[in-house]
């Protein structure tokens, strides 16, 4: 696999002596480059109009940020691209306050990152009041692949495919964490897959630098990670969480690839009018039902969690139901039943996740974030070393033909389309201040 060379940050530690994270102001510096037409680290920036450089094929999706379109290059530019159009933070006849914090953060990080398993940013375009990020195009995402295996009847994703997907996902995550970037929103819809079977981490709108932040991560964004993939420490109100939240999400994604449905599918409690973050009681209950109760012996800092009294109340009200302590057989039963339901072969071998898959899943879904596997350690797990190294093409040897991403032809005017949705929650991020940082390298 061809890799770009450059300077690499030291891996995360308590106080690395010579690390120079991409923090503080290379982020606004990168964004400022977009406004002045200067090149960024990995992509270029321009004031030219989108339609001068790209032919819009159709509309893909919309979200809190704005809209995503599929495009083809023109005027000498070849290939297919995804163009994300950010809506202004507030736009109307009387006021215009710019673009959202998450948009600025994503632009800044995307222009500094370069790894085969992270979506590549081609360029940033400023046009009138809108910002456009042009990405390489991926024909699939994990959510689409999971849905395909559920229709018209349940058909398991091949074990080799799952292993390759996880291996590539973890390689991308190692790179992000080595460079002090926490993704904070890993889920199947944000994991892209190209037609060549290359897995790429996308959507860095909630990503955050975690090396000596100027304020707690909680104060910047009070709600992170989609509810079904949210780690226990986040559910329990941790103010100072770590990249381990991304590994819990990887465990949830692994389980979903196996079972074709979310393993912890809770109902999200919404914030009240005062923007108070509620205890996600139902989601925590879904976790405890399978994983058993977290214990102070296994998780020494459990009682220090802000929402620990709420957890105690939840457990006290369901004492018989949650009788198993962590380390019980709840996850074992779930895993073994999943393999039976989806007709994976019994015994060891490359065609089944096997006992190694269960061992990896347990270490990813560890309650205590300090004991949870890191991305680097996960790559060394015997699940990936038994029966040969995973392929860099998750579709290799697969006879399954996945449908390409659906593109709407009825809404392909990138200039005038309305931009529904609201910005992600969170306060201004003061980690976007300071001196320029050095360019990240691919790891």
From Swiss-Prot:
PROSITE patterns: PROTEIN_KINASE_DOM (PS50011), PROTEIN_KINASE_ST (PS00108). The keyword Transcription regulation applies. One of its GO terms (molecular function) is protein serine kinase activity. Its main location: nucleus. The active site is at 185 (proton acceptor). Residues 54-384 form the Protein kinase domain. One of its GO terms (cellular component) is mediator complex. It catalyses: L-seryl-[protein] + ATP = O-phospho-L-seryl-[protein] + ADP + H(+); L-threonyl-[protein] + ATP = O-phospho-L-threonyl-[protein] + ADP + H(+); [DNA-directed RNA polymerase] + ATP = phospho-[DNA-directed RNA polymerase] + ADP + H(+). It is an enzyme of class 2 (transferase). It is found in: Nucleus. Belongs to the protein kinase superfamily. CMGC Ser/Thr protein kinase family. CDC2/CDKX subfamily. Component of the srb8-11 complex, a regulatory module of the Mediator complex. This is Serine/threonine-protein kinase SSN3. It comes from Phaeosphaeria nodorum (strain SN15 / ATCC MYA-4574 / FGSC 10173). The gene is SSN3.
